[in-house]
């Protein structure tokens, strides 16, 4: 049978790889997309003994569902590596779907991707690698990087004590995904590889095409896996939370209309309010106890500070004094300068921090992550309260 260019590329790929004398073992998380596919291929090329691992999170369409399982299995067959599927639907239901639902019920706007990374993906991957005993590392297709603490010596690091491993932004500023990884631990970082960390997205696609990977031309997912699965977050919310009628109130006290549940609103929202007012109005805050959506002019959305809870310090020891940071309060937003101040409890332990922005910020949204950087280094992050 006549060989295709794809077959020849893969043959050359494996031929060069087989010259490697000593191999290390690594588990690669595979979603069925081009990023994780190329990560696996590059690790094979670099001499790792690779096994693909796909987590079955939900039934249905999408990269986290049945479609992704099929694509991941086919890729592993092409690369000649083992592929394992773990049924993670129960833990995903408990740690992501349930907690996302609870967060919306409290009037927060949650970040399901961070929940999944912290409590599902990396935990399941690490546990599986440990169970294999001879597998020392794990890898994903995230656009982020890891370095050792010596990297930080070039920075102004007043009041910062760095841990052994540092989490860094990806080299591609437009694709950097470190924001979603602030909850990782040193144990995970010590075993983790990001093969795409130094690459740009266009290079990823080009390299996948060169190698003839079956996922090379697969469209990039533009939404959360929950959106892919349910069709929209509104459908997800309607399926999991009962409607509860309440009032939409201007911050001046005037009742402007009704709503069918605070879970349908987020701070800064303008569209879909269903109210009439001479000037555009935006969601200012959500009162869960009174079931009220407060709205205001855009100028009223700005905050000078925020309280950050459940902070995880991934790259540094917990600071005992105030520190200067660049804070990112939503994905895709530019980091802004701020001062982070520890708030001590009566027993002198720290559970929350006050973030004071150098310049007031609009739509600081409870439930979203505030992630702290020093240059390229992700120091830590927590939830906006």
Swiss-Prot record:
CDD domains linked: MnmA_TRMU-like
Domain of life of the source: Bacteria
BP terms from Gene Ontology: tRNA wobble position uridine thiolation
GO cellular component: cytoplasm
Localization in the cell: Cytoplasm
Residues annotated for ATP binding in this entry: 29-36, 55, 141
Assigned keywords, A-Z: ATP-binding, Cytoplasm, Disulfide bond, Nucleotide-binding, RNA-binding, Transferase, tRNA processing, tRNA-binding
Site positions for Interaction with tRNA: 142, 368
Main location: cytoplasm
Pfam families recorded: tRNA_Me_trans (PF03054), tRNA_Me_trans_C (PF20258), tRNA_Me_trans_M (PF20259)
S-S pairs: 116-225
Catalyzed chemical reaction(s): S-sulfanyl-L-cysteinyl-[protein] + uridine(34) in tRNA + AH2 + ATP = 2-thiouridine(34) in tRNA + L-cysteinyl-[protein] + A + AMP + diphosphate + H(+)
MF-aspect GO terms: ATP binding; tRNA binding; tRNA-uridine 2-sulfurtransferase activity
EC number: 2.8.1.13
Active site residues per record: 116, 225
SUPFAM superfamilies in alphabetical order: Adenine nucleotide alpha hydrolases-like
Interaction with tRNA: annotated segments: 175-177, 330-331
InterPro entries given in the database record: MnmA-like, MnmA-like_C, MnmA-like_central, MnmA-like_central_sf, Rossmann-like_a/b/a_fold
Role: Catalyzes the 2-thiolation of uridine at the wobble position (U34) of tRNA, leading to the formation of s(2)U34.
Family: Belongs to the MnmA/TRMU family.
NCBIfam families: PRK00143.1, trmU
Protein name: tRNA-specific 2-thiouridylase MnmA
Species assigned in the record: Prochlorococcus marinus (strain AS9601)
Gene: mnmA
